[in-house]
Amino acid sequence: MRKIDLKVLWSLLSALFFAAGTASALYFRLDGDRLWLQAEQTPLVDVLEQFSRVGVGVRLDPSIQSTVTGLILGQDIDEALEALLEGYDYLLTWKMLRGPLGRVPKLKEIQVYVPGSAASARPMPKKSTRFDATRGVAGTSPEFVKDELLVGTRPGTTYAQFQGLLDQIGGMIVEADAATGVYLIRFPTGTNVEALLRQLGRNPLIAHAELNYVTRLPGGLSTGFPSLPAVSPPADGSIPVAVLDSGLDPSAGLAPLVSAGWDAVDPERNLSDPDGHGTQMAFLASGVLAADGFSASGATLPLVSVRAFDEDGKTSNFALMQALAYAEKAGAKVVNMSWGSEVDSEFMRTAIQVAAQQGLILVAAAGNEPTGNAVYPAAYSDVIAVGGVGADGQPWANSNHGAFVDVSAPASATLPSGSYVGTSISSAAVAHALAQYLNQRPGTTVAAARAALAAALSPAPAGGYGAGVLDAAALRRLLNP
């Protein structure tokens, strides 16, 4: 294989790019073991950043200051790189991506170095991943991640058929969620994915496709953890509670409680919390601190901490699906989700159903705007939706309400960063209570735990605040029936 003169095939390339809805100086697409690339005097580091963007680890000899020129159209990546990286050596590491259509090869890492100097390749500095959100061409859509779609295939579809479809529309498989059968597909920058979504809706190979919707964290919390008491490790064999949020700050002093942790946004990075919300929820869900009206139990619980939100407080549905799957594999039995949006996603609904079928008790905040509109994931039937009340048991003024709310709980707490009010706190309080209950009664089913909670509740105020309130008296009844 040889490099192709850009001028000779520029008209062909332009037609291809504009048909895909994009035109830029650098075009990149990687699908399995095939590469599409258009570059003209493009810094090598910029090309390698494109590999990083689709989840490939990159190691580069820092002495290499090279540019890339060439046109590659669906060629074997080994052959393509041999031509494009003439004068340098490279090493490719592969993994098998498991999805509903079987195992497919996915590039795991690429190393580029001076011949004979493989040890000189260093991890290329990686920019923090941020979910690039948009409201679409018309600006009226719920927020979604640019240039991405989530796709599920019909039974009987083969990988070859699906790959042929992706070739037609210029998509590349980035990841697959085995539990739900969903593929994350990425397209070249600037692609009109809304138009492609309509096209896929008419394709007989596709069962369902969605935009990769964005959810934002509620605001109001700050970071900083002054004067924290030392935290003792939980008892051996304790059942962990998972917090799917903005992560965990390593300076918060909660390390003795962490049984597992993962960054679903930047999987190669150590767990952190640029926002602070996740760390504050971890204090409450673990029992180190308690919502107002409760006393900290003293029986701290193990934590499974998953960072699913980026530095701007945004996440995607696919990241949330991956976070749920990790929580289950890490041994959590209760999952706290102190966030939500009004977007009802079929794929998220399926992910929630799968998690519940696997034995997870799912708890989510009803929201901090009293609209009465359903907020998801709280409104899914497999999730305990939690509204907020004040110290007097009356509705917190900004708590959402409605038929989807299952229970209410105190919405205020004094946290290391100061006082805070929100249904995030209510959700974390309920999650901790249920995790305590399960630790007292290992083996309890999801249905039995939910029934025990419902039976213990104090009366709820009228107006859509659930079947009852989890206050201090209700917590005593739950744990000491």
Task: For the regions a language model picked out, list residue spans one by one.
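N-terminal export/assembly leaders
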Residues: 25-119, 172-179, 183
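C-terminal subdomain of the subtilisin-like protease fold in secreted/lumenal serine endopeptidases
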Residues: 328, 332-337, 346, 350-351, ...
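Protease zymogen maturation seam
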Residues: 122-148, 164-167, 174-180, 191, ...
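Extracellular S/T/G-rich loop segment that most often corresponds to the catalytic His/Ser-adjacent loop
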Residues: 239, 243-247, 360, 375-443
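Loop/turn elements at helix/coil->beta-strand transitions in domains of secreted/extracellular proteins
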Residues: 205-208, 237-240, 299-302, 329-335, ...
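Substrate-binding/charge-relay-adjacent region of secreted/lumenal peptidase catalytic domains
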Residues: 283-286, 314-336
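Bacterial N-terminal signal peptides
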Residues: 10-21
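Subtilisin-like serine protease catalytic core
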Residues: 231-241, 247-260, 268-318, 379-382, ...
